[in-house]
């Protein structure tokens, strides 16, 4: 047993024979035998030799025409029509052809175009969609990143569309399809105006001003000796009243300013021009207390300034020089001897001359 079948009951199929034409077409030999018999009968019924002789006799011999005889070639080929090559015109489309398959295809394309033109967008603007709760969401696809960029949720569709336009211009530039192209035109016009304003030439200052101003600019400084500014240290020998004996003249008769502190004299300034310039006399400062004199020459705190004391009473330098001679020792000795011809002043007279201001 093999697989539940009884081998003794298994009958093998007969051995297949070689495939021949007789096996495929068994009636072929019968047809061949019948055709041979019919051919014999036909040959007996028809005499092919007699028929050939009859046909040959019935054939007309055209050799009677002699080629040497004169004959007109035009008469022979007179009935022959020449060949004419003409283009056949295209058949006009009839009313029946309008209902054909070709006509149906054309009408179908036109109908699709009309449908696409009449079809409205689901949303009025591109790149936005409405949420179930009423707000509008905007998003755009970035081809460089290959992903969609979320732009946010907005209350109105117009705000969402403007956000989409801004992102589209940033990603695709001037080729972007936007919802508000007129804003793009306005932005381009504004950029052009800004560029035009930047390209306008700026007025440059005239490097050569009028010659009159150049000539008159140094009139007041032509006799000034500009030197390096230095802090002035007191070099003058002050007496017990804090005033100088005489006034020296500067170069060319002009006086130099060298005071580094504010002063209350008639022609002093806060500008220091030279170390070698003579010091202007602080005549009106004669009555100031010696304790305050340190403020004039204190280098540690040069920013302190005293209040200006202006006097209306005029004075004369020659009178001051003459009045101060009594302080010298020679003047005292001559005064004792009574040989000084000059009238000496006392301290009370000095106070009255100053005006009684201490």
From Swiss-Prot:
GO terms for molecular function: DNA-binding transcription factor activity; transcription cis-regulatory region binding. PANTHER family: DNA-BINDING DOMAIN, ETHYLENE-RESPONSIVE TRANSCRIPTION FACTOR RAP2-12. GO terms for cellular component: nucleus; plasma membrane. The N-terminus qualifies RAP2-12 as candidate substrate of the N-end rule pathway for protein destabilization. The oxygen-dependent oxidation of Cys-2 prevents hypoxic gene expression via the destabilization of RAP2-12 in air. When the oxygen concentration decreases, Cys oxidation is prevented and an active RAP2.12 accumulates in the nucleus. The N-terminus (1-13) is important for the regulation of the oxygen-dependent activation of the transcription factor activity, an internal region (123-177) is required for the interactions with ACPB1 and ACPB2, while the C-terminus (343-358) is required for positive regulation of gene transcription. This is Ethylene-responsive transcription factor RAP2-12. Keywords: Activator, Cell membrane, DNA-binding, Ethylene signaling pathway, Membrane, Nucleus, Transcription, Transcription regulation. GO terms for biological process: detection of hypoxia; ethylene-activated signaling pathway; regulation of root development; response to hypoxia. Ethylene-responsive transcription factor RAP2-12, N-terminally processed: The N-terminal cysteine residue of can be oxidized by PCO1 or PCO2, thus preparing the protein for N-end rule pathway-mediated proteasomal degradation. Belongs to the AP2/ERF transcription factor family. ERF subfamily. InterPro entries: AP2/ERF_dom, AP2/ERF_dom_sf, DNA-bd_dom_sf, ERF_plant. Signal peptide: none annotated. Induction: Up-regulated by hypoxia but not by ethylene. Transcription factor involved in the activation of hypoxic gene expression and in ethylene response. Partially redundant with RAP2-2. Acts as a downstream regulator in the ethylene signaling pathway. The keyword Transcription applies. It comes from Arabidopsis thaliana (Mouse-ear cress). Interacts with ACBP1 and ACBP2. Its main location: membrane. Highly expressed in seedlings, leaves, flowers, siliques and germinating seeds. It holds the Pfam family AP2. Residues 124-181 bind DNA.
């Amino acid at each position: 047993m093999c697989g539940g079948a009884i081998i003794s009951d298994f009958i093998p199929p007969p051995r297949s024979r070689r495939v021949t034409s007789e096996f495929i077409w068994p009636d072929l030999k019968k047809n061949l035998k019948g055709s041979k018999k019919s051919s014999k009968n036909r040959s007996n019924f028809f005499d092919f030799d007699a028929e050939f002789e009859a046909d040959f006799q019935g054939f007309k011999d055209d050799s009677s025409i002699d080629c040497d005889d004169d004959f007109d070639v035009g008469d022979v080929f007179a009935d022959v029509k020449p060949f004419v090559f003409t283009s056949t015109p295209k058949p006009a489309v009839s009313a029946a052809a309008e209902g054909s398959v070709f006509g149906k295809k054309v009408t179908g394309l036109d109908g699709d175009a009309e449908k696409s033109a009449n079809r409205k967008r689901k949303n009025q603007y591109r790149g936005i969609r409405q949420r179930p709760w009423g707000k509008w969401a905007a998003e755009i696809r970035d081809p460089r990143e290959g992903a969609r960029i979320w732009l946010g949720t907005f209350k109105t569709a117009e705000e969402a569309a403007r956000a989409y336009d801004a992102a589209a211009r940033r990603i695709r530039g001037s080729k972007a399809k936007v919802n508000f192209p007129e804003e793009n035109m306005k932005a381009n016009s504004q950029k052009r105006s800004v560029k035009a304003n930047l390209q306008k030439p700026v007025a440059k200052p005239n490097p050569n001003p009028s010659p009159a101003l150049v000539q008159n600019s140094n009139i007041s400084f032509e006799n000034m000796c500009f030197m390096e500014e230095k802090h002035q240290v007191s070099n003058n020998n002050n007496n017990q009243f804090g005033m100088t004996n005489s006034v020296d003249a500067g170069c060319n008769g002009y006086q130099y300013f060298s005071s580094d502190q504010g002063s209350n004299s008639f022609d002093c300034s806060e500008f220091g021009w030279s170390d070698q310039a003579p010091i202007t006399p602080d005549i009106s400062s004669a009555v100031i207390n010696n304790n305050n004199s340190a403020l004039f020459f204190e280098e540690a705190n040069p920013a302190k300034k005293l209040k200006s004391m202006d006097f209306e009473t005029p004075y004369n330098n020659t009178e001051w020089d003459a009045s101060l001679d009594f302080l010298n020792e020679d003047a005292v000795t001559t005064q004792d001897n009574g040989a000084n011809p000059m009238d000496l002043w006392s301290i009370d007279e000095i106070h009255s001359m100053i005006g009684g201001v201490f």
